[in-house]
């Protein structure tokens, strides 16, 4: 009699486990029906950079996924637009800046990115960079 009870209990437990697994597979299939997701920008949880969330929609479905905005990103391009940059050009004496151009390498999450961009930065003298390099190595 005890063997029958044990066998019946084991059979019920096995049935419960297989039912739970089948339900989980159905959930995965329902979520994967959508193939055209539209993703918004990564919005940091605090300040301008760091961990945040990105919202995506597909039909009536909405998802939020974790994402990260690098702290060295340039706001004018967006964190999801990746560019390949040329070398810095010569220093323009009239403006005191040098420039370089970047061409779009990758647009993540269907981001709207410019094909080419131009960035500038102030010119620096060679002596300053050498002094910083020496200071960083512990030589004064």
Swiss-Prot record:
From the Swiss-Prot or TrEMBL record, what is one GO molecular function term? Answer: growth factor activity
A GO BP annotation: response to auditory stimulus
Question: What tissue specificity is annotated for this entry?
Answer: Expressed at a low level in arteries, and at higher levels in newly formed neointima. In brain, expressed in the caudate nucleus and the brain stem.
Look up the signal peptide feature and give its range: 1-20
Show the GO cellular component annotation of the record.
cell projection; extracellular region
Give each disulfide bond as a residue pair: 34-58, 42-67, 49-71, 81-113, 91-123
Subcellular location, record wording: Secreted
Q: Where is this site: Required for high affinity binding to PTRZ1 by interacting with the chondroitin sulfate chains of PTRZ1?
A: 100
Matching InterPro entries, A to Z? Midkine_heparin-bd_GF, PTN/MK_C_dom, PTN/MK_C_dom_sf, PTN/MK_diS_sf, PTN/MK_N_dom, PTN/MK_N_dom_sf, PTN_MK_heparin-bd_GF_CS
For whether the record's keyword set contains Secreted, the answer is yes
Induction, as annotated: In arteries 3 days after injury. Expression continues to increase until day 7 after injury and decreases slightly by day 14.
Q: Which UniProt keywords apply?
A: Developmental protein, Differentiation, Disulfide bond, Growth factor, Heparin-binding, Mitogen, Secreted, Signal
Q: Has the keyword Ligase been applied to this entry?
A: no
Q: Name one Pfam family in it.
A: PTN_MK_C
Q: What does this protein do?
A: Developmentally regulated, secreted growth factor homologous to pleiotrophin (PTN), which has heparin binding activity. Binds anaplastic lymphoma kinase (ALK) which induces ALK activation and subsequent phosphorylation of the insulin receptor substrate (IRS1), followed by the activation of mitogen-activated protein kinase (MAPK) and PI3-kinase, and the induction of cell proliferation. Involved in neointima formation after arterial injury, possibly by mediating leukocyte recruitment. Also involved in early fetal adrenal gland development. Secreted protein that functions as a cytokine and growth factor and mediates its signal through cell-surface proteoglycan and non-proteoglycan receptors. Binds cell-surface proteoglycan receptors via their chondroitin sulfate (CS) groups. Thereby regulates many processes like inflammatory response, cell proliferation, cell adhesion, cell growth, cell survival, tissue regeneration, cell differentiation and cell migration. Participates in inflammatory processes by exerting two different activities.
The Swiss-Prot or TrEMBL record describes its family as follows: Belongs to the pleiotrophin family.
- Assembly and oligomerization: Homodimer. Interacts with ALK. Interacts with LRP1; promotes neuronal survival. Interacts with LRP2. Interacts with NCAM1. Interacts (via C-terminal) with PTPRZ1 (via chondroitin sulfate chains); this interaction is inhibited by PTN; this interaction promotes neuronal migration. Interacts with NCL; this interaction promotes NCL clustering and lateral movements of this complex into lipid rafts leading to MDK internalization. Interacts with LRP6 and LRP8: this interaction is calcium dependent. Interacts with ITGA4. Interacts with ITGA6. Interacts with ITGB1.
Q: What is this protein called?
A: Midkine
Q: Which organism is it from?
A: Rattus norvegicus
């Amino acid at each position: 009699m005890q063997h029958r009870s044990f066998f019946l209990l084991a059979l019920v437990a096995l049935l419960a486990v297989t039912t739970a697994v089948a339900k989980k597979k159905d959930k995965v299939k329902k979520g994967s029906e959508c193939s055209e997701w539209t993703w918004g920008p990564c919005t940091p949880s605090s300040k301008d950079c760091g961990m945040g969330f990105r919202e995506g929609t597909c039909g009536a479905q909405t998802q939020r996924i974790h994402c990260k905005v690098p702290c060295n990103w340039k706001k004018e391009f967006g964190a999801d637009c990746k560019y390949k940059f040329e070398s810095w050009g010569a220093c323009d004496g009239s403006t005191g800046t040098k420039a370089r151009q970047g061409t779009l390498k990758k647009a993540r999450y269907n981001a709207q990115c410019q094909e080419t961009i131009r960035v500038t930065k102030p010119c620096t003298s060679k002596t300053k960079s050498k002094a910083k390099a020496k200071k960083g190595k512990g030589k004064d």
